[in-house]
Amino acid sequence: MLRLVLPKGSLERATLELFEAADLGVARSSSVDYKGTIDDPRVSEVRILRPQEIPAYVAEGLFDLGVTGRDWVEETGSPVVSLGELRYSKATANPVRIVVAVGADSPAEKVDDLPQGVRVSTEYPRLTARYFAGRGIEADVRLSYGASEAKIPDIADCIVDITETGRALRAAGLRIIDTILVSYTEVVANAESYADPARRHAMGQLMTLLTGTLEARDKVLVKLNVSRADYDRVLPLVPA
């Protein structure tokens, strides 16, 4: 019924582990196969693609449902329906942040200290351009295909980059001066597919499985042998 697309790359392992724990395990012929199957009648197709591409493909109707980051929904501006957050990222349950960072020796303490014409290296050119325009700063936004932190100071004056803990930026001698966006992993749907009652119902069931699995990670299963005579006295003492 549902054509599903999952993220490849940094979110891939955590996403596949979540689906496995939710009894929605993805079977593939190899770890580099971009196609998979889920033994569930609600899922007819599984593809694994870069998260940057997923919002546009879902909006276009190539897939009914996708897992990507809020950062890429904002960057692409794709008109998708958000079904909600899945609170995990590459290494932790914390969100990632899209931040503005400068070299440790930069005189800029905040974004408004950056000069007009500031050179910005980023993998998020649209999001970055909108952000600086909103601050009234004319920015020379330069698309980066990675390792943005290595481009300060000779190629760029600052970067807009993604970070989960900030450690990599600090290790590169950079300092964060603002956060543009806090981004969780998100489930997005095609608008027409979501308008179909049967598909929307199936989407809701899958979301319940995934969010329930995440919530259960913070829970502990406690089993007790209690006599019927003591049941009413013991029950209020059990945390739930």
Regions found by a protein language model. Give the residues of each.
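Domain-level signature for soluble enzymes in the chorismate/prephenate branch of the shikimate pathway
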Residues: M1-A240
